[in-house]
């Protein structure tokens, strides 16, 4: 289950469906990814074809990333069976 968001626009999108805080053309894919993340109990549950799940390094060590589109990524970490600090970023 998703416990916390780092990106406020992503949190609004997840709770209301409003796309104001995200790239509108990413809405469909983000919706699928957020629903999957909300059901996930470990990072491996997000290892779906085309999502390119991978662990992050450096300052984001302990976080995971899945590809949304181009350079955009959905990043998160798991504490127990819950996802937290869910972020939507262009970090490349």
Predicted regions and their residues:
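Arg/Lys-rich, positively charged N-terminal/basic patches that mediate binding to nucleic acids
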Residues: 1-33
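Alpha-helical interaction segments
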Residues: 2-4, 41, 61-68, 78
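A secondary-structure boundary/capping signal
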Residues: 6, 49-52, 87
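PIN-domain endoribonuclease scaffold, especially VapC-family toxins
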Residues: 27-41, 46
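N-terminal, well-ordered alpha-helical segments
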Residues: 32-35, 54, 74
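A short, surface-exposed loop/turn module that caps and links secondary-structure elements
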Residues: 41-64
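Enriched for short, Lys/Arg-rich terminal
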Residues: 64-92
